[in-house]
């Protein structure tokens, strides 16, 4: 984990709380039942009291996924999203919209992430020159693939020398069809009020954002799911490779993504198991607590290379050094 290679600004907890409306995940829904259209903005306090809602937060036992859930009993809909990671794909935001009501509905979805950091932005720069930094930001999206690239026009410097920013942050969507793309948060209020919004292909001098808009019908007892996938430290070769995969293998990428996440989970379990972190008992909470403790110990101190086997020569040298 590095504050110098983050997807969002690396802030203290109080700033994260204060900026929850303009940083990170943001979803807005226009839901139509018959002739009535309802505006629903999950996890926002803008329309507090308008609906009978229930909110939950979950984390899996091994700590690789965190899931946020808002149940709207008034509309008969549940929206969930989870943050997970993948060695190959980066940060994965997976969303689900579930209709548990008795009637079908038509949903217009606007989903995305805000205040994305381009690459080559240090935490010191973000915390000291955040407003100046915005002027250097450039966002663009390839409409054919939906792949967005967020970069700096140049690295901030007060010296008379060229300093190119050759790395970027990328975001793409998987699982949605007939999608419009937007690159700034300025379209949010227009969407809330039902006004038309124009697809954006390039934005300069503004905080980076990635939004997708689409419409679909959701029958009673059915659900839709999709992914927003972001990664940092991407060079031109990686971006070209990702673009080609989106063109030729888009449908297969979802299965590859889920398989990759499962492989990462298995690898983490194997690492923790090598430090005796796996146990089974009648107390599930105690078992989960033990796993977490061992995992954090491993993060601090590492694991043995070959279980409890060591080289005789190394052991003799260690004993000699400590006792001479």
What annotation goes with each model-predicted range?
Residues 1-324:
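Anionic coordination/interaction segments
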């Amino acid at each position: 984990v590095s504050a110098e290679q983050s997807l969002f600004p690396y802030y203290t907890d109080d700033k994260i709380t204060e900026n929850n409306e303009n940083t990170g995940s943001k979803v807005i829904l226009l839901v139509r039942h018959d002739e009535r259209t309802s505006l629903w903005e999950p996890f926002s306090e803008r329309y507090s009291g308008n609906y009978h809602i229930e909110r939950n937060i979950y984390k899996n036992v091994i700590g690789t996924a965190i899931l946020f859930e808002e149940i709207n009993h008034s509309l008969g809909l549940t929206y969930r999203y989870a943050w997970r990671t993948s060695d190959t794909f980066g940060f994965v935001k997976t969303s689900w919209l579930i209709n548990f009501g008795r009637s079908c509905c038509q949903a217009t979805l606007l989903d995305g992430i805000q205040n994305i950091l381009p690459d080559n932005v240090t935490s010191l720069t973000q915390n000291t020159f955040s407003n100046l930094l915005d002027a250097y930001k450039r966002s663009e999206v390839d409409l054919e693939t939906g792949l967005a690239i967020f970069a700096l026009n140049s690295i901030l410097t007060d010296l008379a020398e060229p300093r190119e920013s050759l790395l970027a942050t990328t975001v793409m969507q998987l699982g949605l069809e007939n999608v419009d793309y937007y690159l700034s948060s300025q379209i949010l209020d227009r969407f809330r009020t039902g006004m038309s919004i124009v697809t954006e292909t390039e934005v300069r001098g503004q905080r980076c954002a990635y939004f997708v808009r689409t419409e679909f019908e959701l029958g009673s007892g059915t659900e839709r799911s999709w992914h927003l996938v972001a990664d940092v430290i991407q060079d031109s070769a990686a971006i070209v490779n990702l673009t080609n995969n989106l063109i030729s293998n888009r449908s297969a990428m979802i299965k590859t993504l889920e398989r990759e996440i499962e492989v990462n989970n298995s690898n983490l379990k194997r690492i923790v198991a090598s430090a005796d972190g796996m146990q089974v008992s009648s107390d599930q909470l105690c078992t989960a607590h033990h796993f977490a403790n061992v995992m954090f110990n491993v993060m601090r101190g590492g694991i043995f290379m070959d279980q409890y086997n060591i080289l005789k020569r190394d052991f003799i040298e260690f004993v000699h050094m400590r006792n001479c």
